Amino acid sequence: MSTLRLLISDSYDPWFNLAVEECIFRQMPATQRVLFLWRNADTVVIGRAQNPWKECNTRRMEEDNVRLARRSSGGGAVFHDLGNTCFTFMAGKPEYDKTISTSIVLNALNALGVSAEASGRNDLVVKTAEGDRKVSGSAYRETKDRGFHHGTLLLNADLSRLANYLNPDKKKLAAKGITSVRSRVTNLTELLPGITHEQVCEAITKAFFAHYGERVEAEIISPDKTPDLPNFAETFARQSSWEWNFGQAPAFSHLLDERFSWGGVELHFDVEKGHITRAQVFTDSLNPAPLEALAGRLQGCLYRADMLQQECEALLVDFPDQEKELRKLSTWIAGAVR
């Protein structure tokens, strides 16, 4: 029986693909070597320990229907669209070795006519007249008895959108996370005009088979045709949840300030695991009572635009004479934290 397993996803859903990856990684026999090929529609994928409000322009993502997906590996934030090919190599220990999977990808690129090399811990670069350009980035995860290496290859990604979603709004964030480094990148289509996702997948598959001297039939998977993976529904529910994608952010502080016709407002939030642990309000308003009440209501609230807006509008019951001011405040807060 072959020790190899090859899975190719027909789904562009990042939560589905990452849930498949997680399930296979947890449940695979330690003797198995797995290659999983996939790609995501418009998504910002962040590292396990990153703060989405610091890394991403969450407001623009929401406006453009770009999803946020937190992966289980470390590293920085990346933007995925259908111009990216994603790969995941998994193996048990002691056989797991990320240099092997890196060499498989390099061999695949070489077979396609691209001479690339590893750079640093995570990147593959090609040499151009303008200098080295990154075409692939990777991240890794290891447990006691297994490990995986996953990454992306830039085929024909819309590089302008990279900056749209990975450059956050100028919010006053004092975060404990680390802002991702923006690398100089290029698409493989600049070197191989017309190259397709299918061609890249075929090249990686051939290099995978060649390295291990075995072949295996590909398992084509999609939400309508999921592999036999125990607990997949629970894993998908977690992967797609707000609690995982946003709520796992490291602790951070956020200052919002705005001047309205009735006075200036400063809101100071301390946030842990997606919940406001402390809220302070400062204002020169002649009627500070609604804002003081708001500070109390926001303690323990989810740091989510709709929840903050809901708490703000709940004050209308106690302060009906300030309806106009509270509705303006509510709209501003919701927009500021998106």
Swiss-Prot record:
Pathway: Protein modification; protein lipoylation via exogenous pathway; protein N(6)-(lipoyl)lysine from lipoate: step 1/2; Protein modification; protein lipoylation via exogenous pathway; protein N(6)-(lipoyl)lysine from lipoate: step 2/2
Gene Ontology terms describing biological process: protein modification process
Enzyme class: ligase
Main subcellular location of this protein, as a coarse class: cytoplasm
Gene3D superfamilies (UniProt xref): Bira Bifunctional Protein, Domain 2, CO dehydrogenase flavoprotein, C-terminal domain
Sites where the protein binds (R)-lipoate: K134
Annotated residues for binding of ATP: R71, G76, A77, V78, F79, K134
A GO term, aspect molecular function: ATP binding
Domain of life: Bacteria
Subcellular location per the Swiss-Prot or TrEMBL entry: Cytoplasm
Matching PROSITE patterns: BPL_LPL_CATALYTIC
Stretches assigned to the BPL/LPL catalytic domain: 29-216
E.C. number: 6.3.1.20
Disulfide bonds: none
Note, other: In the transfer reaction, the free carboxyl group of lipoic acid is attached via an amide linkage to the epsilon-amino group of a specific lysine residue of lipoyl domains of lipoate-dependent enzymes.
Entry similarity comment: Belongs to the LplA family.
Reported function: Catalyzes both the ATP-dependent activation of exogenously supplied lipoate to lipoyl-AMP and the transfer of the activated lipoyl onto the lipoyl domains of lipoate-dependent enzymes.
Protein name stated in the entry: Lipoate-protein ligase A
Organism: Escherichia coli (strain ATCC 8739 / DSM 1576 / NBRC 3972 / NCIMB 8545 / WDCM 00012 / Crooks)
